[in-house]
């Protein structure tokens, strides 16, 4: 009788322990997201090279565009971190950038880390959010006193990439969100190579974020 009760007790303890471990593991599961952005922009005329109307071969440097592919992860809403930062996610991204003047400037790629979160809730399906990007851009055609002497804004093939955006985040479904807003971008090398006037853009952005494994917050009754 006592032995039978002890066995039942141990079985109950093991079941509780197993459920607890499973719940803890479930709470550690991350939410994974894939995003795609298109960002048309205007190039700020901050130097003579950008202000001139003549660009040698009829090329202009007024408009720019970038195309972004991103992977992000978010904390489980049932974890401690997820409850502290319920709308924050971060990750890595790559982008292809064009300025309409490949000959003198190039069409660089960028690789970066990013973070996004909510600023204000507007409704149950709409919020006002921000996102920052920080990384490096590659593939520029830098200044060369013989072959690319007009380009005095970019002095190196690799430059820092910095971006800050604000946008409306609309929840289309459990899996998909639409992002529409505006952003600012800066490219430069921090004076590691001269000349380094840098390049700045301001523009719009539209994108989609797809959540691969949405996890709902658990509401426990007391």
Label each PLM-derived region with a short phrase.
Residues 1-36, 126-128, 170, 174-176, ...:
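Bacterial Sec-dependent N-terminal signal peptides
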Residues 24-74, 213, 222:
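Short glycine/proline- and aromatic-enriched beta-strand/turn motifs that initiate or cap beta-hairpins
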Residues 30-32, 61-67, 105-111, 126, ...:
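Residues that define the transmembrane beta-barrel architecture of outer-membrane proteins
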Residues 34-38, 90-92, 130-134, 166, ...:
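Membrane-embedded beta-strand positions of outer-membrane beta-barrel proteins
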Residues 38-44, 73-75, 94-100, 134-142, ...:
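Transmembrane beta-strands of outer-membrane beta-barrel pores
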Residues 44, 78-80, 170, 174-178, ...:
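Repeated loop/turn-to-beta-strand initiation elements of outer-membrane beta-barrel proteins
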Residues 53-57, 99-102, 148-154, 189-196:
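Extracellular loop and loop/strand-boundary signature of outer-membrane beta-barrel proteins
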Residues 85-138:
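Gram-negative (and chloroplast) outer-membrane scaffold detector with strong preference
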């Amino acid at each position: 009788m006592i032995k039978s009760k002890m066995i039942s007790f141990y079985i109950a303890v093991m079941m509780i322990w197993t459920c607890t471990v499973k719940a803890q593991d479930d709470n550690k599961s991350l939410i994974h997201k894939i995003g795609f952005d298109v960002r048309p922009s205007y190039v700020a005329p901050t130097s003579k090279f950008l202000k001139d109307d003549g660009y040698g071969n009829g090329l202009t440097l007024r408009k720019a565009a970038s195309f972004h592919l991103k992977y992000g992860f978010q904390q489980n809403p049932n974890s401690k971190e997820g409850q502290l930062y319920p709308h924050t996610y971060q990750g890595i991204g790559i982008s292809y950038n064009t300025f309409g003047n490949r000959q003198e400037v190039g069409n660089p790629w960028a690789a970066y880390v990013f973070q996004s979160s909510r600023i204000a809730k507007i409704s149950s399906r709409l919020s006002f959010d921000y996102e920052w990007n920080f990384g490096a851009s590659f593939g520029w055609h830098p200044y060369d006193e013989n072959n690319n002497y007009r380009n005095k804004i970019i002095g190196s093939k690799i430059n820092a990439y910095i971006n800050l955006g604000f946008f409306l985040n609309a929840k289309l479904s459990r899996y998909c969100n639409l992002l529409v807003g505006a952003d600012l971008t800066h490219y430069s090398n921090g004076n590691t190579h001269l000349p380094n006037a840098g390049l700045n853009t301001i523009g719009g952005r539209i994108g989609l974020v797809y959540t691969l494994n949405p996890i709902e917050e658990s509401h426990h009754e007391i």
